Each structure stands twice: as structure tokens, then as C-alpha cells.
Amino acid sequence: MASIDFRNKINWHRRYRSPQGVKTEHEILRIFESDRGRIINSPAIRRLQQKTQVFPLERNAAVRTRLTHSMEVQQVGRYIAKEILSRLKEQNRLEEYGLDALTGPFESIVEMACLMHDIGNPPFGHFGEAAINDWFRQWLHPEDAESQPLTHDRCVVSSLRLQEGEENLNDIRRKVRQDICHFEGNAQGIRLVHTLMRMNLTWAQVGGILKYTRPAWWRGPVPDSHRYLMKKPGYYLSEEKYIARLRKELQLAPYSRFPLTWIMEAADDISYCVADLEDAVEKRIFSVEQLYHHLYHAWGHHEKDSLFELVVGNAWEKSRANTLSRSTEDQFFMYLRVNTLNKLVSYAAQRFIDNLPQIFAGTFNQALLEDASGFSRLLELYKNVAVEHVFSHPDVEQLELQGYRVISGLLDIYQPLLSLSLNDFRELVEKERLKRFPIESRLFQKLSTRHRLAYVEVVSKLPTDSAEYPVLEYYYRCRLIQDYISGMTDLYAWDEYRRLMAVEQ
């Protein structure tokens, strides 16, 4: 096992205009402060305030949005990072691990990774993701890319349809179709940071949000050694070269993860489990007393001084006994949050330290809070109660179905841009309006300037005389539409759908 030296991981260089020379501890910290400013002031972070956490189109400001959730994750991530550093300091291992002058950047990378962890999520959360993928699967039929004979290919796009005698090109077609039909919020986050927003963050900071290490075009089984790390797509074909450079800069083996990403993941797991239940009480899906009974019965066998009694039972008893001028709801969730954090943060920090050789190598093939311990069981308890009593509630399911229809409907509306021939779309991009395509011209004008420029830049660099050109042009055209629609807030997507469908406001 190679030695653990975080100076090889906390890489403060950037893709463009990178700082040069040897830097002092203070200068390195200033570089990461610059990252913080770029992230906090980015439009992608601001848009999180109108994106779904659990309840779409929620008008009650007390219920969490993606932004307030991300801020809570940021705080928990900071807490875990500080706990890890404190324990390593007590063990006199900070210098051994190359962290003695990097404690500030260590904390900052974790905090900002937590704040950014959801920036790629589309409107309406996972149902928005499903709508995008289902729509493009019906359009491109990626499963037919393996069909024999090739005449069974139902793809409606001629440039992506498999052709006899074009095996090399067919491999690219398969890759492109698979990639487009696997939109994923984490992969879109990488695309936002590098390609669309051009934030030019340090390599270490971007490494912190590369949660999954499987490329979106992957076909077939994943290796058992990386099954957890590769359970979802982590980046797209469009960012393949950037990720290859990222791996080199952070000394990451293929399909391995950046060490601090495990902390971000644990902070997210801890935060949303309690928060989803609190929001459900705020929405009157159930009362706090009903919630306690749901948790009690779901835990199963009860023993004195069990983790359930120390965390949930303690919160329930204190909230009932406390005579402070606060509601039982407020007190219960205050105590539940404090008790949960104290137990799970401590456990996550120790798991990080105990498994540091594998984590540093990027090969630890599970989450910090995913094992056979009671702490993992407590987290699963919260998740299971939320699944059974919150996510399955008729009001929540109705809003999710509406969100799915909105995203599917918007893709239907913008489909004419995907139906244009290569030459017609290229002419539309150059002239921005064409009389013979009045609908397509108006749809093109509605696309974000940032997204259009990203498309133009990458396509202009493709060799037009190459056989791959029509395939890759269409790939980036699909990305253009996905970028635009996934970047909408819930409310904007809802309003845009109603406007374009001529539904009365």
C-alpha cells in the first residue's frame, strides 16, 4: 500500500490560468477561498432555491429546497471534517499524512463539495431525471444498439442508426446513444462546473463532487471491486478528456474516487434523512407523535440503552417533558437532529480514519455509513419511514407525476430542433432565424445563450470532413437540449410548460 500523503491529493492547481510556483500555507488557503467565492456566487447555486428537495413547487418557506438542504449538508460536512482532523491531531498523524499545513483546504473542499453536490439536479428531482432518460430512450432506443441484425435498430436519428460495414462508427454511435440516455444529476454537476459555467475550480475541489466513477456510456457489468463506486453514471462523454486530466492531477486510478468525496456523501446521508421527516411534519403528512410511532414500530425489537432509545427515544421524551416556550415539534426535531448528528458524525469520522488506506487510494467500495452497524441501521430506519410514509403519500406522488409530465412535455415541445437535419440546424445556429423554419427558429431563440455558446464552441472544433462529425454533432445537440431543460428551476419549468402548451395561467 502506498504511503498516505494528502499533499498529492489536495491539488490547488486549475485547468486554466493556474497559480505557479511553491505556495505558502496562507497562499494555498487563499486559492481555496477563491474557489469558495466562485461557487457561492454562481447562478447554479442560486437556482437551487427553487428546485425540489422532496415537495415540488412548495410555497411554504419553512419546507426545504435544494439550497437549504445543501447548506445543511455543508454544515454537517464541515463538522465531520473537523472531527477527522481533530482525531488525527490527537494521534499525532497530521504531519505523517501531509495535512499539518492543509487543514484549512481540507475543510473548505469538503464544505464546498457539500454545497455543490446537487447543482446538476434537474427540475422535480429524480422524476425529472427519469423523464429526461425515458424520453431520450424512446427517441434513440439505445437497447437496439446491440441488435442483430442491424436492420432491427429503431433509432429515429439517421446519423445514429447502426449501419452494415461501419463497425468503428457503430461503436461511437452505441457510445453516444448510451451516454445521452443516462442523464444523471451528479454527471450534470461536473458538466456545469467545467463546461457550462467555466468555474475553473481547483482540481481537488472538482474531485470532491465526482461521486460516481462510471462513465455514462458504460455498457455491461461493472467490476465487483468498484460496484458501489460505479453504481450510477458520474460523468458524460463530453467531459471524458477533462476527467482523464482530473485523474492524472489527483493521482486517481481508473474508476477510483477522491478521498474527501466520502465525507460529502456521509454528510448528505445524515442531513436528508432527518430533514425529509421534518418537512413531512411541516406539511402535515403526519404529526410528530405519529412519526415517533412509525419510527418505533419500524425499529423492531427494543432494548434499554439501544441506539434507538439514545437517539429517537431520548428526543421524544425530552420534547414531551420540556416546558420551554417552543412547540413539541420544534423541540423533537431539535433533539433528534442533535442526537443523530452526535452519533453519526462521530461514527463517520472514525470510519474514515479506520479505512484511510483504501479511502486514500479511492477504492473503498461502500459509503461510510453503509455497514452492519447500528448507526447504519438508524440511517436506514429514517430512510425506510420516509419511503413508506412520505414519498408514497398521494400529494407527493401527484406532484411527482406532474413534474414528470412537465419535463416530458418540454422535451416534446423542443423536439423539432432534434428533428432538423445537420445542415439545416447548422444554418439555424449561424443565422439564428430561418423563415422556412418559423417554429424551430423561435425555439432556438428561447435557448439560453450560455448553452448555445457551449454547443457552438465544441462543434466548431470537430473536423467537418470526418465520418464521426454527424454523430458527434447530434450528440452535442442533444446535450444542448438537456442542458437547457435540466438547468430550469421547478417553477420556471412549470410556467414555461404552461405557456408553451397555451394552458391558462
UniProtKB/Swiss-Prot annotation:
Homotetramer. It holds the Pfam family HD. It comes from the Bacteria. dGTPase preferentially hydrolyzes dGTP over the other canonical NTPs. It comes from Salmonella paratyphi A (strain AKU_12601). GO terms for biological process: dGTP catabolic process. This is Deoxyguanosinetriphosphate triphosphohydrolase. InterPro entries: dGTP_triP_hydro_central_sf, dGTPase, dGTPase-like, dNTPase_1, HD/PDEase_dom, HD_domain. Belongs to the dGTPase family. Type 1 subfamily. Gene3D superfamilies: Hypothetical protein af1432, putative deoxyguanosinetriphosphate triphosphohydrolase like domain. The gene is dgt. The keyword RNA-binding does not apply.
